[in-house]
């Protein structure tokens, strides 16, 4: 019933490790989790109060996210990055993993993926049926690909579209 592309995917190693550590905790083992993306910080009280104040809201939101929130994000990033970001180019989503997946499914071309990288990016590219071009990064370059390395990939075929997944840290 499932497409072969789904059947061939391996389980996420981070989710598997989290599952094993949870089982060990149930058995009484003391586990220190350093890798799972769960925030160790409490949700700020202002956010908790706003969520309470808006709990009655049950309508679908605009696809790009709330206009006021997008404007606030654009203004904040514009201030931090000394570049004028437009709220029309800001998308608010349910999480970065979902947005990265959607981007790769919609993108027609090859994905340039620095290595090491987060475990989800390559499977997302595979599900999007995109070819992956991996660039091995080094400590000397702060785990970022160099301009020359990126250029080398692109010059192999200038007629293709390329999407470079670049974030810091490379997760």
Residue ranges of model-derived segments:
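Short beta->alpha connector loops at strand-helix junctions that form conserved
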Residues: 115, 134-139
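Conserved PLP-anchoring active-site segment centered on the Schiff-base-forming lysine
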Residues: 106-125
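N-terminal small-domain helix-loop-helix segment of the aminotransferase-like
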Residues: 2-3, 7-94
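Short glycine-rich anion-binding loops that position phosphate/pyrophosphate groups of nucleotides
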Residues: 39, 97, 168-171
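A short helix-loop-beta submotif of the ANL/AMP-binding
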Residues: 127-132
